[in-house]
Each structure stands twice: as structure tokens, then as C-alpha cells.
Amino acid sequence: MKCVLGVETSCDETAVALYDGERGLLAHRVYSQIAIHAEYGGVVPELASRDHIRKILPLIKAALDDAALSKENIDGIAYTKGPGLIGALMVGASVAKSLAYAWRVPVVGVHHMEAHLMALQLEESRPAYPFIALLVSGGHTMLVHVEQPGRYKILGESVDDAAGEAFDKTAKLLGLPYPGGPALARLAEQGEPKRFIFPRPMVNQPHLNFSFSGLKTHAVNCFKQYGGEEQTRADIACAFENAVVDTLIIKCLRALEKTGINTLVLVGGVAANKKLRERLGQVAVKRAAQIYYPRQEFCTDNGAMVAYTGWLRLNAGEKEDKIIRVKPRWSMAELNIIN
């Protein structure tokens, strides 16, 4: 299997990419639906699905043009099978399987979280296996022991709101535009870090699970007590971000200590957070640990990570039939080891 087309439509980004086993990433295109969902303050699933339908085929054509390839050069197709929004997933699955049937090439469904874990394999500097991954993407926050591709052990995960969800909900409370996470991080830069001190949830417990819903409640209480003046909003944002970042770092260090592994990987949309990257980098230097994270464009949802993961699984002999199936909920424990 040489050249694989990757299709990503799990939420509000329509993304495609072409990955070649010999030449690497040949092209990738991403169309964001931020402008569509901004007026609603969050993703509207029906609108997301409809916009994927409009954008997916033109994006595939654009990626093929970027790489100076045609359909005859495609050896396989990968698409995001789950987890995600069911309607959005169905668009990507339908297009991928239809093209695979028309072009007579194999097709495979990819786990969205596994694709995030594999994003670093697109970089020149890659971690050696095994490593610990902090995966913070949308509705997921988890610490994963990655022994090899396809062999994963979940060490801890969010028991209520994930970090990304807590960022978005707190941003909405503060009257910030969608997408809330980046807007909150920008506002936090103007905040006074010592005015409010939020709790660091579950850090005194021995397990590696996360809970961020209490931080959102804490922000609500501060907002009600001190009002919505601009500086107060910035101070609340700063306190919230510091609490989330500290909690993630404490749990990461505990995971490294428990496993004896000294390599940490940071992936997913929240991995683009500037403060989290800076603080983890500082901690890694003190601990003499190795830390890796992908470039910003590969932190958020993209087709490149899907194309690469699909390339791995297709070359391991995996392929699917013509029936269109998606998995809006899909545990990583169900994945096969890639040999």
C-alpha cells in the first residue's frame, strides 16, 4: 500500500490529506466551519453535516491537484469512523466508501483518538515506543500508555467534563466567542494570576482520572460574586486556565512515575494551548524527560493523521466491506494491534 487518501469529518472540520509511504505527506487541506457555528455559540450537528456534504468533494479534488495526482494514483482510502457526531461521520464514511468502490481500492475506518496519537509520526522528530500520551481533544481527556501502534492502555480519563469542554463552557459563561478555548486563553493572558485561586481537582487522589466540571462551577460563582467587568473576566480566565494546566501536568508527572516511562506526548486540540506547552516544557527540563507535540495544524482535527493511521492499518491487512457503518462511541480498547 503506497498512497492513501484520508478523510476527516468527525465534528466541525472537513479535512482531507494524501499520505505516501515513501514520500510522506503529499497534501492536506482543512476547511473549518467556525463561521457557521459561531452565531450559535457551539457546533450544531445538522449544520455540520450539511456543510461537510458541500465541502468534501471539492477538498479532495484540491488535495489531488496540490499533489499533482489523479484517482489512478490512490491505493487506498481511510476515513474517520468514530467517535464523533453521527451525521458528520456518515458523510465522511459515505464519500470514502463510494470512492473506494468506484476506484476499486480498499477502504478502512480509523479511530479519531488513535489518529491523534499517530499525528506525531508525521513530524521529523518522533517519539520512540513506548510513551505516555496526554490526549486532550474535544470531549476527551485521557492519559494513554502507548506500547506500540494499536496497543493502548488507558491510565486515566475524564469522569465528567473533558478539559476542552470545560474551556468552551467557561468561555461561553464569560461571553467569549466560539471557539471558546482559544478565546479564553487569549483573555487569560491579560489576567492577574494571584487574584483568584481555583482548586486543582482530584490531584490528591492516587488515580489518574480527571474532573473539570467543578472548575466551571467555580468560575460561575466568581462571576456572580464579582461581576463581569473586563479585568475580572480576564482574572477568572487566568485562574481557570492555570488550574486546568496545573491539573494536567500533575497527572502527567504521576503517569510517568507510575509507569517508569520518561517520554511524554501531548496531542489533540488543547495541545495547541500555549501555556500548557510552555509549562510542560519547563517541567520536562527539570525532570530530564522527553516531551513531544505536533505542530499546531496537526493538534486540531486534520486529514493527515487519518491518512497516516489508515496507511498503517491498510498495510497491516485491514479493510472493510461496502456497508456504511460509523461508531459515534468507540472505545480504543476495541482496536486491533498493528503488526
Swiss-Prot record:
GO cellular component: cytoplasm
Cofactor: Fe(2+)
GO biological process: tRNA threonylcarbamoyladenosine modification
SUPFAM superfamilies with a match to the protein in the record: Actin-like ATPase domain
Matching CDD domains: ASKHA_NBD_TsaD_bac
Residues that, per the record, bind Fe cation: 112, 116, 301
Gene Ontology MF terms in the entry: iron ion binding; N(6)-L-threonylcarbamoyladenine synthase activity
Keywords in alphabetical order: Acyltransferase, Cytoplasm, Iron, Metal-binding, Transferase, tRNA processing
Record's subcellular location: Cytoplasm
Note on how the cofactor is bound: Binds 1 Fe(2+) ion per subunit.
Record InterPro entries: ATPase_NBD, Gcp-like_dom, KAE1/TsaD, Peptidase_M22_CS, TsaD
Binding site for substrate: 135-139, 168, 181, 273
Catalytic activity: L-threonylcarbamoyladenylate + adenosine(37) in tRNA = N(6)-L-threonylcarbamoyladenosine(37) in tRNA + AMP + H(+)
Alphabetized Pfam families for the sequence: TsaD (PF00814)
Catalytic activity, EC: 2.3.1.234
Top-level taxon in the UniProt lineage: Bacteria
Xref: HAMAP family: TsaD
Family: Belongs to the KAE1 / TsaD family.
Name of the featured protein: tRNA N6-adenosine threonylcarbamoyltransferase
Organism: Coxiella burnetii (strain RSA 493 / Nine Mile phase I)
